[in-house]
Regions:
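Intrinsic disorder/low-complexity detector
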Residues: 2-84, 125-208, 244, 251, ...
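Short, well-ordered alpha-helical segments
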Residues: 60, 65, 74-117, 182, ...
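Beta-rich nucleic-acid/ligand-interaction surfaces
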Residues: 118-124, 241-248
């Protein structure tokens, strides 16, 4: 079936049921039939991923466009706007699940080097523009699906991570593996930010408290996610803080409110089960020849009584190093 013959209504039903669009299914099926693959890895990331026993299969992606809600509806109170926070979480979860499904379809062990693009659109009321209407969020993720047998995961459950080839190589060398992608978001609203908690030349305490509270909410939820994946620590954290002043408009009020957005991404990491440190190869000692300033190499200076003795010791050290290297090679 070619792309021109796709039944768009049938494809939409697949998406509504939580599956992949038909076009994506055809693309993935085509890529698994040959050795050519697409990837968003750089040259260095690709080579180090190969060295870390990660074999690229295909580029995978997921996206969602989610209706968040109306900004102007939350007035007269300070606290987290649960409906908006949850809408952001659902949008990201939906995009990640579609990326996950693409990786599943081609038998990947992991998705690495995941890039995240987020765009927030504020639409005016009745199509007139402005920022007094609904919020629509577009969330897109894409990365490279790889086969990596050394990464521990349940059958047909690939690990998704924003770590690139260099990061994976470094973790593997020390016996660690990614175990899950963590993400969290919080929208915290401050009512009448300039009315309370403010003095001339002083800190805007209500705004500062809002930022700290939003961070606290996000961190606590991330800790819960890390516990679910049995992660020992989180790496590659990307924390974004946005503070936006918004008009109150509550019962004709002309004061301003504040919206605080905290977004946090990262990868949970744990020790590879049964991992044992690799023995480092023995490196023969290196001899560093030092030549005093003003003297040429091999030049003998009159009155230097120790020069012959030092030269003899240097030759003996070089001979011992060569013999040790030969012994190691024979072993």
């Amino acid at each position: 079936m070619g792309p021109q013959n796709i039944d768009l209504m049938e494809s939409m039903r697949h998406v509504q049921a939580g599956g992949l669009p038909i076009r994506a299914q055809l693309r993935l099926a085509d890529e698994t039939r040959h050795h050519l693959f697409t990837s968003d890895l750089t040259v260095s990331e690709f080579l180090l991923a190969k060295d870390a026993k990660c074999t690229p299969i295909s580029q995978v992606m997921g996206s969602s466009i989610f209706h968040v809600g109306k900004i102007a509806d939350y007035k007269g109170a300070t606290g987290e706007i649960d409906t908006i926070s949850q809408a952001h979480r659902d949008s990201r979860r939906l995009a990640l699940s579609r990326c996950f499904q693409e990786a599943q379809a081609i038998g990947a062990d992991a998705v690495i080097g995941m890039r995240i693009q987020e765009r927030l659109i504020t639409m005016g009321q009745h199509g007139k523009g402005g920022d007094d209407g609904d919020e629509v969020i577009e969330f897109t993720v894409f990365g490279t699906a790889v086969r990596a047998p050394w990464i521990t995961h349940p059958p047909n459950t690939p690990i998704v991570t924003d770590l690139n080839g260099q990061d994976l190589w470094a973790l593997q060398q020390d016996g660690f593996e990614p175990c899950g992608f963590l993400f969290e978001f919080c929208r915290y609203h401050v009512w009448h930010v300039m009315k309370n908690g403010f003095s001339a030349g002083g800190e805007v305490t209500s705004a500062q408290e809002a930022i700290e509270t939003a961070r606290h909410i996000v961190v606590n939820k991330l800790i819960q996610q890390a516990g679910y994946y049995k992660a020992e620590f989180v790496v590659g954290s990307d924390v974004k803080l946005t503070v936006k002043e918004v008009p109150c408009g509550y019962k004709g009020c002309d004061l301003n409110d504040l919206d605080v957005d905290v977004s946090w991404f990262g990868t949970g990491v744990r020790r590879i089960p049964g991992w044992k440190p690799h023995e480092q190869a023995k490196i023969p000692p290196l001899i560093l020849s030092m030549v005093p300033l003003g003297r040429k190499r091999g030049e003998i200076v009159e009155g230097d009584e120790d020069s012959d003795e030092l030269a003899e010791k240097a030759r003996e050290a070089e001979q011992e190093a060569a013999e040790d290297a030969d012994d190691d090679a024979n072993e």
